[in-house]
UniProtKB/Swiss-Prot annotation:
Belongs to the UPF0178 family. InterPro entries: UPF0178 (IPR003791). It holds the Pfam family DUF188. This is UPF0178 protein Lm4b_01466. It comes from Listeria monocytogenes serotype 4b (strain CLIP80459).
């Protein structure tokens, strides 16, 4: 039975993930740094890791198995986990595909170089209720068809 792993530090759709997982009776593991520690986890399965730059990513890589569902905005982590045979969603419900990763990583690299030169672009728009609903619908549809 697959599980859902969530890169939870900045994930805006944790409640939606939990609802979908309960409906499909899937386990969810939220992975976050101790910077986001809370004693109130509402019975959810949370794993807290050191605050090091890649600590949460490393834990997720170790936990992920073929067929698992991952939710992350981290393109680098997504590319590694896709290679392990997982299904990776963005926080906006986009299902990443291996054949897109090279281009996405290249764009990420170019944006990082631009930032080093002081050139900044606008970030993503704030999550709306419609965005949350779209994420939930896409994850639900994926699981229904799996």
């Amino acid at each position: 039975m697959p599980k859902i792993l969530v890169d939870a530090d900045a994930c805006p759709v944790k409640a939606e993930i939990k609802q979908v997982a309960e409906h499909f009776q899937l386990d969810v593991i939220f992975v976050a740094s101790f910077n986001h520690y809370s004693v109130n986890t509402n019975g959810e399965n949370w794993i807290f890791v050191d605050t090091g730059k890649e600590s949460a990513d490393m834990r997720m890589m170790n936990l992920a198995k073929k067929g698992d569902i991952i939710v992350t905005q981290d393109i680098g982590l997504a590319s590694i986990l896709l290679a392990k045979g997982t299904f990776v969603f963005s926080n906006r419900g986009e299902l990443y595909r291996e054949e897109e990763m090279s281009l996405m990583l290249d764009i990420r690299y170019r944006h990082a170089k631009d930032r080093q030169q002081g050139k900044y672009s606008k970030g993503p728009k704030a999550m709306s209720d419609q965005d949350r609903s779209l994420f939930k619908d896409r994850l639900t549809t994926f699981l229904q068809n799996k």
